[in-house]
Amino acid sequence: MADLQFTKGQGTGNDFVLFADPAGEIDLTDTQVQALCDRHFGIGADGTIRAVLSTRIPEGRAALEEDPDAEWFMDYRNVDGSPAEMCGNGIRVFTLFLIENGLIELPPGRTIPIGTRAGVRDVQRSGSGFQVDLGRWELAGGEPLVRAKDLQVARPGLGIDVGNPHVVVALSSEDELAEADLAFVPQLDPEPAAGANVELVVPADPLVVDGVGHITMRVHERGSGETLSCGTGAAAAALATRHWAGAAAPHQWRVQLPGGALGVRMFPTEDGEHVGLSGPAELVFDGVVALA
C-alpha cells in the first residue's frame, strides 16, 4: 500500500484532489480515483488532477506538438475514474497548485500554456484569480430533447462543444431550476455517443445590465453528477444564451452557480472566435493518504 501526497483545491466549489507526478509514475486505477473522491470514506472531490510533465505521457507529447512551451499536462479524472478532456475550474486550481509547489513561476499578468486532452489552453494570472482561454467553440450535437427528474416535460437542449461536450437547456424561472433533481442523470434523446454535461439555465430579467449578460445555472457533469460549479459548463451556458438572444446579445457574461460566480467572454482571434473563463482558485489543505 503506497502513500500519496495530495492537495485539496477548489474553484467556486468545484473541488479536486491534486497531486504532483512529474515523472508520470502514478497511474491511478478507476477504483482508486473513486475511493479518493468518495465524500464519506475518502477525501471527497468532484475529480482528481495529476500534474505530470508533458514529455512523460502520450497525451502530453501531443500537447507539446501543438505548443512546445506546454511543459505541464493536466491529467483530469472524473469521480468514476473516466478521463475528461477539459475542466475550466480545474485548470485554474491546477495552475495555482503548480505555482504554490514551486513547479512554475507565474507573476500576475503573465500567461502559461497548459496541456489538456482538449489541447493546449492558455492561463493568465490576474489579481483575483485566473483567466483561461478555452479556445474555439462550436455548435455540436444538435438539439436533443432533455428529460430531467422533477421537470414536468422534456425540453429541447442546444449542443455546444468547448473542448468537451455540453447540452444547455433554458428554463423559465429559478423556481423551476430549483425543482430539478440533478442527482439523477438527465436523459438525452438522441444520446451523444460520448455523453455530455447538461446545464439548466435561467436568464436574468433584465438579461443585460451595463453591457454584461446575466444567467443562473445548475449542472450535471458527465461522470461526476451534480457539482457546485462547472467552468466549461458556464462558458457553454453563456454561449447558448447569447445564441438564443440574437445578434444584439453581449459578449461579456456573469454566470451564477451554486458555488459562486464566473465570468465568460467571447472574443475574436485569427483562427475564429474564442471563449474565455475567469474566476477564483483556492488550495484548501495538504495531506497524505494510503492508496489501496
Curated annotation (Swiss-Prot):
Annotated Gene Ontology cellular component terms: cytosol
Family stated for the protein in its record: Belongs to the diaminopimelate epimerase family.
Record keyword tRNA processing present: no
GO biological process terms, semicolon-separated: lysine biosynthetic process via diaminopimelate
MF term (GO), any: diaminopimelate epimerase activity
Site (Could be important to modulate the pK values of the two catalytic cysteine residues): H166, E221
NCBIfam families recorded: DapF
Reactions catalysed according to its record: (2S,6S)-2,6-diaminopimelate = meso-2,6-diaminopimelate
This protein's name: Diaminopimelate epimerase
Record's keyword annotation contains Cytoplasm: yes
Active site: C87, C230
